[in-house]
Each structure stands twice: as C-alpha cells, then as structure tokens.
C-alpha cells in the first residue's frame, strides 16, 4: 500500500490554448507541484506555450492536431473549440495511453479545462480520476447552466431580440441581465449553447476546481455544489495561491515599469483590453481623445492585430492619436507588475476573469468595458455587487470616456471605490493564507488524490 501511494504522484493537466486559460492552469500546476506532485502539461500545436526555464521541472507534451490558425478567425472561438475537441480526441487518447505505459509514476488525476471537454471521454476509458478546472468565475459557470436551461424552454427571446428586452433581469440571477449572459459576439446564441452543453456536462468528473474565492461568490458556489452534486473547490485567486513564472504568449515590454516609476502614487490609469478583444479604428480614436481630455496619466496596451476595420496601418494610426507626455503606449505589458505598482490608481479593463482577479488582488478599482462572453457578467458584478467598478456601456464616445476616468480618478466616488477595493484585497490575501478558505480548499482537494 505504501509503495502504491508513493507512486501515485503525477498530475496531467490539459489547458485551452488561449492566454486566459493557460495562465491559471499553469498556476494550478505550480501549486500542485509545490505539494509534491510531478506535472505533465498537454498542449496543442495551436498557440503552443514555449515554457520558460522556471518550468523545467514540468513535462510538456503536444497533441498533434492540424488546425490552421485561420480557423479561429473564420469559425470564431466557440466553433473553433468544438472543432478542436473533435480533432484532438483520438490523438489525446493515444498520448494518454503512452503516458500510462511509459511513466514510472502513476497518474493521480487528469485536470482539464472545462472547454477541453473531450478529455473526460478519453480519460473515462482508462478509468482515471478526472477533474474539471473552470478558469472563469463561478457566476459565469452558473450563467452557462442557466443559458442551457432557458434555451431548452425557448426562454432566451430577450437575448435574441435585443433592444429594450435585453436589459431585463434574468430570474434568480440578480443582478445579471439577459445582455450580461455569456453569449459571444463571434457566434449565434445557438452555437454558444451547443458549446455550453458540453462544458456544463460533468460526466465522470470527481470534482470541479474554480479559480475564485468564497468571499466573492459564495451564492454561486453553493448553487453549483447543489447542481453538480460533486465537490466544488474554490481555489483562488490562483495567481496569489503560489508564485508562478510568466506564461505570456506575447512578449512583455517592461519599459513601462520604468515610466511608472516616475509617476506619482495612484496617478495613472492602466488600459488593457486583454489578449482577444478587437476594436474599430473609430473606437480607438475616441478612447485616445477621452483619455487625453481627462488630464490623467495613462499607460495603454495596444496589442498588435487588435484594431480592425482600419485602412491604415497600426503604426500610422498611433501617429494620428494625439498622445501627450501624460500617456505611454506599449504592445503588451507585464500586467501583474503593473497592477501592483503604486503609481496605478485604476484599470480600464475588458473584465476577463484573470484581469478582474489580478486587479482586485491589488486593490485597484476598474472601469469596465466588456467585449464578449463571461466578461459581461464580471463587469456587472464589479459595478453592482462588489461596487468597485464603473461600466461604460453603449457606443464609445470621448465625453463618456473622459467622465468615467474622472469619476474614478478624481471624484469622491472613486475614493470610495478605492477603499472598497483595498478591503477586498485584504480578504483575498487572507483567503490564500493558512486557515483561509482557498488554502483549505486546496488542501481538501489534495487529500482526495
């Protein structure tokens, strides 16, 4: 028995090949590695992460799939993930079989991103323990469930029709409106629901890990626990649970830290819309005018390829944008370092879940401009539940942008949000310390292995 336990040490992890999913999966891997487990990370050729030297203790293996990069653009993320699942199932099963034959260590469990749902079917054939990792919020998980249930009852008319009806509240999901449900700008409601049916299916999963904190989402976690009828572990924020090396798919420009060093405390608004958001040229120019008119210092991340519908190059567009010496623009930034910097007083964000947790973890209030899917619900919670955010809705217009920036950076309302954000920061810090809820959840999960 002792020999069997000592060999049951390897954990296999399967992330979605996207920045917002890879990062928390690697953070979880680091947490498990710190507890004595060996780690194997299964990647696709698409968006392959070139591991840093800090991850040299991890084994990285690749599923041989043949999806062209153009598929993501042509199909949209939802349909692309469905195609990826169909493409990877057989090769993943073969790879898993090889791991079982070749490895000296037994596999304790396979942890897969909920959107890599094909893993559950493959793992089941080998009778291995499998665990779902949700890299979105618990509330987003609930919303996906509810969308599937409403769709089955033809109850998503408000979302399909748009207009005034989409601002109606979803029954029993206050303060979520129909427009806040995690539908995608890249896909129809029907396509989104098709994907969510797969992600919400627990199959033979023994448990679910969610990158969240009980103090933020207690009611959603309790809802999921009752609905799924398997243990739900809130182990987050994962970036605070353990120190992990950068896993950025884009090169980070650290010159912005030197620029921040020259600014006054809480005087800079950091602007970043994530690794996937697309913007029209007109929107980008309106943002530039709004930020400059606010008379606030700003650090702005403009990702290559993020401006669509432009007849001129991004370099030419940047020249057209009247940026004063109060502004600093980079293509990509070391976000956790930026948010932790004393000069940063606010974050204009797309409200992806990682960005949301990183901002709350540093006590930085947000201006919320969600783009798609779960970002909309996150923004709603930031504004209406946690009260540390201001949502900018509708068409982007320079006056509205200027007013939002001043509300957060100048007005008393912003000071109150900052105080609430700092209070949440302390609660999140406490959750990952010994006796904290997330620390206990991680220990409880490890005991099951």
Curated annotation (Swiss-Prot):
Keywords: Glycosyltransferase, Transferase. It comes from the Eukaryota. This is UDP-glycosyltransferase 76E7. It is an enzyme of class 2 (transferase). UDP-alpha-D-glucose binds at residues 275, 333-335, 350-358, 372-375. Belongs to the UDP-glycosyltransferase family. It holds the Pfam family UDPGT. It comes from Arabidopsis thaliana. The gene is UGT76E7. Its EC number is 2.4.1.-. InterPro entries: UDP_glucos_trans. GO terms for molecular function: UDP-glycosyltransferase activity.
